[in-house]
Amino acid sequence: MEKLEIAFEPMLGDDVRQHVMEGLHAFNYVATGQDEHYPANFTLRGEAGDVLGGLLGYVWGRWLHVTYLWLAEPARGGGYGSRLIGQAEAYARKRGAVGSTLETYSFQARPFYESLGYQVCGQIDDYPPGHTKFILKKALA
């Protein structure tokens, strides 16, 4: 076998990131038969086009996974977070998703997600120290 090296690369190039993701998707397809992977990214922009928030996620295996949801301070409390989630869920339903999953922390938005029908299905205590990480899910079908 050829000699292999592990390299720390804090700034991966897009080509390397894409190669790793494609390898994982191929592996997952063999194991699950699920090949369809849809990006589910939505932005909230001001009149000048500046980004005031966004939701980054994807649909795979008939589930929406919300990876990130963020709103700039001036956009919070105006219903935009709910609208971003709603748009992502509608997009996912059109692609056959039956559920949605996301993660949040005790210092972030658990009550917000619960108000939208998400339920805690797992947690990791003391991550980061003094806080809790929550895994939530919601049925979409």
Regions found by a protein language model. Give the residues of each.
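Conserved N-terminal entry element of GNAT/NAT acetyltransferase domains
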Residues: M1-L12
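Short hydrophobic/aromatic beta-strand element in the GNAT-like acyltransferase core
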Residues: P39-T43, G54, Y68, K133-I135
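Conserved acetyl-CoA pyrophosphate-binding loop and the N-cap/start of the following alpha-helix
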Residues: A75, G79-Q87
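Conserved GNAT acetyl-CoA-binding A-motif
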Residues: A92-Y105
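A conserved beta-strand-loop-helix scaffold within acyl/acetyltransferase catalytic domains
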Residues: D35, G46-E47, L55-L64, L69
